[in-house]
């Protein structure tokens, strides 16, 4: 990768050049108007002299951005033009929230603590919008090894906003969720209590005398989840969210068609152990929901269709559906197509099988997307992009990092938080696995040609899938299918959510299939799908399966956008488990018989 660093001299020359060009354009219009005055009315001439905003590119066109000289001197991207303002000293605030209705035995009142930086134009009485990062990661970690508190600009996400947006007249706020840092109350992992505190933080930021009443949120992973939690409460101050690999609901984060990720067993405990101080004050952080969370993972993993937590614990922690009902803001969705921490199905899956992205889009929400072949990273996080392996985005590294990310986000926030500039194009920027970017109206693309391949046409080895109960599985029996080339003389572009429908016979109330798709010629991984046979209909609703039951497993691959060269086909390798998924609890007692001749 080549890095170009703009110098001060180059920026001065560029600025003078732009001013000179605009002066010449202005003089040409003056001369033209003088000539036209001799022959005709001035109607329209003065309008063209001063310009029509619709006829002039307010920002550089997306297709021309690759020609621009981006500042690549930092660990994150920069806006094209530095703002005229500076950040004032950090300020702090603590306010109390009535929590008497959210926790049965928890505190009736809890405090939210936050820190914020105002831009210098507020000294003149100007009102400004707020960009907030809401997180459990302030003062996070074991005692003596904690991260910074809210009053320190956080590395990465906070620094990115502080450097790029505060100079342009935005306030930056960093908010600690309940039970973390100096915020009191229960650490209610993704629960109703946590959402209530987040909502009141948005309300506080939007109602301050220095605020213009418009709040936008930013952040990745958990800090993307808190954005959906805020949206679920529907604050009128919350105008836009930018979740980057943000969790939309807890159950689909930890389970895919019943297949459990290893972390599902310990997720709540991991967070709780890193947010407490191990002293008497911790008693305030322990509530019934925390104890319930400790048991939710093992119970769901072992009980399947008999799990008592599905209708309470996980439903409470599903936010995207509540936001859809309660909120009317805009969403800029950022997702790594090779992110196996917060999987792409957080964006492209819903209880009825339709992608959430398109559900929001078709309901009239203003939605935009940027989908790159990166992992659990920001679009401009080049230090992480460079470490991706083949089959996991490695083939796209050369064109992956978006040095225009800060500018792209700037144009989004300017419109939705200030009402400045043109409305952003509501499209999807999607990167293919070979690195090529393109623009679609939506994703998965609706104009894609659907093609069905019978697995009966593929050469198969094995018909049983089984293993033992360990993390990642230990295969005893596997199925491999080698399928013929899609085309001998044309490239094939796979784009969307590939379905894998398997005709199977069960041996037990349980059993699981993990399928990896590869390029049959190169062996490069293209994607994966997984399913517990009790969830054979798809989604998260299990059904009891009896021995010798014949079930059609309606599996779906995580989002794939990949190119297949002429003469290449696909290979499917089916094992009991893979990646970081647990093998089924029933182990080698629940093999699954796959019938390729009736599968596709």
Can you say where each PLM-predicted feature lies in the sequence?
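Secretory targeting signatures
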Residues: 1-58
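Glycine/threonine-rich phosphate-binding loop and adjacent beta-strand/alpha-helix elements that clamp
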Residues: 55-80, 89-100, 405, 418-600
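Accessory cap/linker subdomain of secreted extracellular hydrolases
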Residues: 56-82, 150-151, 155-161, 167, ...
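N-terminal cap/lid segment of alpha/beta-hydrolase-fold proteins
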Residues: 75-126
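Gly/Ser-rich "nucleophile elbow"/oxyanion-hole loop immediately N-terminal to the catalytic nucleophile
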Residues: 120-125, 186-193, 200-221
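Cap/lid segment of the alpha/beta-hydrolase catalytic domain
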Residues: 130-206, 382-393, 579
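A catalytic-pocket lid/entrance helix-loop region that shapes and gates access to the active site
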Residues: 193, 218-285, 337, 344-349, ...
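Short beta-strand/loop motif that positions the catalytic acidic residue
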Residues: 327, 333-335
